[in-house]
């Protein structure tokens, strides 16, 4: 029976479907190439970790609905552990997988690099391994490993040995003795205890550490052995072919310690930052990995107390990728987000902006120049009007009417004056005024009259300091009615008296053109007969004989 749309059975059926089906996943901010966990504090993990046999998400959603992995299952006990990613190394066989029955804690630093570049990390012993292909004897190889804070490798478990045999070590083109099989110096020595029917001896650890190690089986001795050698050094022989390597085929050899061979170094795991630098204990650093915004503390060779910075999503970009070396730096993967055309457009915009700025600046400078030019023209017109007011529009000879001559002639004007304040508007302090002389009015070159002559006009020709310079002049007055004698007397009186140090001509020139000498009143008209008196130079001077009228 199909429920009706308006009945409550349809609502119950819909709720049942929502309960049974998979809940909708929230929108997580995971980058491309990452797996989004359904719930928990860990939201994003690398995509290769999905279905790898080790639950990384807290809800184990990365191992849900995964195909079953067939392989050999080995039980483990105690603190013994194996590498959960064994068999997934370079060149390894994915089907050769060792399951772990011990619960592994989900750690935020489980994917971070704990060894420097070139070293292979093994989680079971928290150690790093590296093969050096340069041919050295046993003792030189041991010193090389010690300089790297390690030693020649020893093995504590069979799983550790399997991990070393499964690795594909770097193979340069020209390596020492590199063939289908290789021998590596390791940290064991075989001590001879007897030479009866056969060589008898025991294995010893050359460099003892804090952890327990297992001893190899009886070795294969070298074909050429010296009877004086009682100590032989161990060599681990492994094969280069992947088929033989993943079947754990290997052998132990006891060789002379002075033979040259490749060697295997082992060191404890350490904190390595994103720039492949070894970090000391207790220091903050950014571990190696895909998150450069992670900050951790180095403790026991592992990053702990990690704090991650959340970066804001880049604006205007739908698909992007994080920079693996710099925090909060993204690379846009949109078709036109990082194209050559976009770069060229940005460059063209920059060029156009520079040209526009240059044109605007040029226009401003041109406008300032035009304003100053108009102000100069207005000032010149004001000066012309000023000259027309004082000289009836006639141009003054010798006056500079150009812009450079402003202020040198009649009533100068400043360039900053726009003329609105009046023709004679000045700024403090005012410029010096220059007196103007009209060219059509001839100015006399004679000096002004003496000061004494201005005060006492009667003594214009008298200088008390020059009493001795004047000689008395006798003047005989004619009788009344003698016209000829009167005219002669008048002519004598009009002549200036000679002075010491000055000629008569100088005295004539020094007199003002508007001055005139008047003759005393006629004795015949006044009714009195004047007595003849001596002129200056005698014992008594006459001060009423001459009058000067200006």
UniProtKB/Swiss-Prot annotation:
GO terms for biological process: animal organ morphogenesis; cell adhesion; cognition. The modification Phosphoserine is found at residue 381. Predominantly expressed in brain, heart, lung and fetal kidney. Low levels in liver and adult kidney. It is found in: Membrane. Disulfide bonds join 30-44, 37-57, 51-66, 145-265, 233-257. The chain crosses the membrane at residues 350-368. Residues 369-550 are cytoplasmic. GO terms for molecular function: carbohydrate binding. It holds the Pfam family Lectin_C. Coiled coil: none annotated. Residues 270-333 form the VWFC domain. One of its GO terms (cellular component) is membrane. Residues 69-92, 500-550 are annotated as: Disordered. It is a single-pass type I membrane protein. Residues 115-241 form the C-type lectin domain. SUPFAM superfamilies: C-type lectin-like, LDL receptor-like module. Glycans are attached at residues 149, 196. PANTHER family: INTEGRAL MEMBRANE PROTEIN DGCR2/IDD, INTEGRAL MEMBRANE PROTEIN DGCR2_IDD. This is Integral membrane protein DGCR2/IDD. It comes from Homo sapiens. The gene is DGCR2.
């Amino acid at each position: 029976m199909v429920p009706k749309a308006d009945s409550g059975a349809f609502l119950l059926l819909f709720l049942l479907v929502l309960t049974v089906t998979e809940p909708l996943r929230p929108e997580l901010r995971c980058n491309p190439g990452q797996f989004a966990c359904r719930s928990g504090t860990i939201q994003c993990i690398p995509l290769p970790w999905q279905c790898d046999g080790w639950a990384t998400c807290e809800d184990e959603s990365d191992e849900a609905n995964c195909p079953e992995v067939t392989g050999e299952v080995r039980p483990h006990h105690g603190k013994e552990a194996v590498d959960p990613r064994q068999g997934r190394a370079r060149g390894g066989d994915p089907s050769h997988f060792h399951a772990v029955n011990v619960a592994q804690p989900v750690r935020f630093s489980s994917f971070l690099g704990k060894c420097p570049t070139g070293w292979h990390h093994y989680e079971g012993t928290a150690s790093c391994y590296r093969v050096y292909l340069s041919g050295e004897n046993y003792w030189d190889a041991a010193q090389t490993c010690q300089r790297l804070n390690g030693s020649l490798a020893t093995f504590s478990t069979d799983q550790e040995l399997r991990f070393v045999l499964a690795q594909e070590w770097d193979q340069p083109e020209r390596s020492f003795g590199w063939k289908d099989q290789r021998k590596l110096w390791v940290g064991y020595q075989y001590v001879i205890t007897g030479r009866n029917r056969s060589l008898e001896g025991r294995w010893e650890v050359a460099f003892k550490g804090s952890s327990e190690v297992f001893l190899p089986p009886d070795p294969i001795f070298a074909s050429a052995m010296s009877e004086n050698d009682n100590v032989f050094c161990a060599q681990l022989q492994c094969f280069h072919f992947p088929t033989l390597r993943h079947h754990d085929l290997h052998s132990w050899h006891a060789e002379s310690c002075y033979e040259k061979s490749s060697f295997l170094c082992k060191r404890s795991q350490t904190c390595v930052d994103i720039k492949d630098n070894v970090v000391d204990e207790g220091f903050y650093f950014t571990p190696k990995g895909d998150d450069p915004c992670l900050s951790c503390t180095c403790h026991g060779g592992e990053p702990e107390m990690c704090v991650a910075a959340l970066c804001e999503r880049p604006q205007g970009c739908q698909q992007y990728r994080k920079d693996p070396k710099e925090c909060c730096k993204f690379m846009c993967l949109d078709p036109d987000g990082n194209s050559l055309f976009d770069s060229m457009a940005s460059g063209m915009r920059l060029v156009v902006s520079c040209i526009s700025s240059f044109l605007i600046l040029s226009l401003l400078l041109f406008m300032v120049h035009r304003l100053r030019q108009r102000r100069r023209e207005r000032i010149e017109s004001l000066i012309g009007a000023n000259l027309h007011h004082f000289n009836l529009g006639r141009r003054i000879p010798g006056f500079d009417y150009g812009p450079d001559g402003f202020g040198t002639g009649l009533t100068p004007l400043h360039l900053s004056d726009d003329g609105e304040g009046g023709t004679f508007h000045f700024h403090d302090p005012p410029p010096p005024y220059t007196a103007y002389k009209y060219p059509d009015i001839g100015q006399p070159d004679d000096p002004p009259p003496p000061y004494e002559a201005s005060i006492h006009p009667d003594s214009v020709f008298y200088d008390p300091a020059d009493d001795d310079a004047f000689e008395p002049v006798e003047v005989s007055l004619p009788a009344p009615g003698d016209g000829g004698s009167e005219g002669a007397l008048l002519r004598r009186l009009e002549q200036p008296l000679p002075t010491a140090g000055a000629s008569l001509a100088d005295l004539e020139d020094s007199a003002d053109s508007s001055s005139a000498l008047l003759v005393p009143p006629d004795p015949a008209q006044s009714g009195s007969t004047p007595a003849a008196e001596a002129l200056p130079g005698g014992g008594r001077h006459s001060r009423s004989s001459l009058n000067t009228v200006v």
